[in-house]
Amino acid sequence: RDDVESRGLGDVYKRQALLYNTLDGKYIKTCNLKIIQILKEILCEKNCGVVLLPQHIYDDIEIKTFINELQSKFMGDIIEVSLSEGKPVQILPYLNYKDLHKNKHQFSSLENLLQTLCEITIYLDNTVNIKTLIEYLRSFSLNLTYNIIGDWKDIPHGSLLIDYLGQMSYSNYIQCSYTHIPLLESSLKKNFSYQVYVSLPVDHSLMNNTCIFLDQQKIPFQYIFQVTSLEDCNEAVTLIEKYDIDKYQLRPLYTKDNISFLAKNTFLTEEDILSTKISMKDIFRKHIINKDNFGKLFILSNGDIYANILHKKLGNIKTDSIYQIVKKEIEIGESWLRIRNQKPCCDCLYQYICPSPSDLDLMIGQLNLCTVNNK
């Protein structure tokens, strides 16, 4: 008789099981009920990652083949019972905050709740009160990532905000259209970068001027091409090659009538999901938080604050402290803790291997932007 142990992360859903090695991304997927039963026993906390394997079960060719694969992928092993004085113990990774989404006060009791905050996006137009905004930012004085949307040069005291952020943070981004790029003072360039959004088709004269302008600024920049069709993708590739653009993204947009384009080009397949190596920390992180949204806030020009523009507002800079805003989002918000705990994702083998739910999911109104459970 032998003891069998597993060193991979394992999940069992109904009649399927997945073992995943977070060190190299290798995996074993099985629908064999005999193997699934063994895995269930291994994953049971009281068994401490090790179960007894009687000889008659080990002699089963399917079980033996599985164990050989387990060993070859360094995801588990078998140990002769006679070589051990007692049952071996293996510490399996378990999530400490299993009921976090039921007991969100566990998050709110953090010694410094504001440590969860990492990024603020600020929208500017001629209605914004810059002095009130700066006063609000000073109330917590954290070294965060700041994104600025809008041209501060047309706003009274707008330059005060840019000066303040230049002193407060080394990670500031000017998000703007390629048709209008605000000019930064030379003294601030080291603490700012441009994120230039390109809607297609482009005005080629403006695009040419923008590329020349950015090359002259000696400041980091990235182009974000907003694509809604295959034609947009082709044009983006043409522009990238023409202007020798190194840093760029192709970001899909939903227009209500391009779902077939998105389904064909952005929906994940099973192969896509398993092609990227994911760390154990990332997998457990996605049990608790939305990796794309957690820690991010948006401040509109009227002072309203959101965790996600597609969700309800959390408050306003004139009436709510940043602590109240963060606490509210954690306790009753819809964005930071939005995970794949709803159907069909909660019944899927890849629930926490998949990326966190995205804004595209919200806009389309479909949680599973994949082909795994849509067959």
Language model features with spans:
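Long, charge-rich, low-complexity alpha-helical segments
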Residues: K29-D125, N129-T145, S159-Y164, D347
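A broadly conserved sequence feature marking short terminus-proximal activation segments
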Residues: I79, F284-G333
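Core AdoMet radical
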Residues: L113-V128, L137-H157, L165-L184, N191-S205, ...
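Non-catalytic interaction/Regulatory regions outside core domains
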Residues: L206-I259, Q366-K375
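A C-terminal junction/extension of Radical SAM enzymes
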Residues: N234-N308, Q351-I353
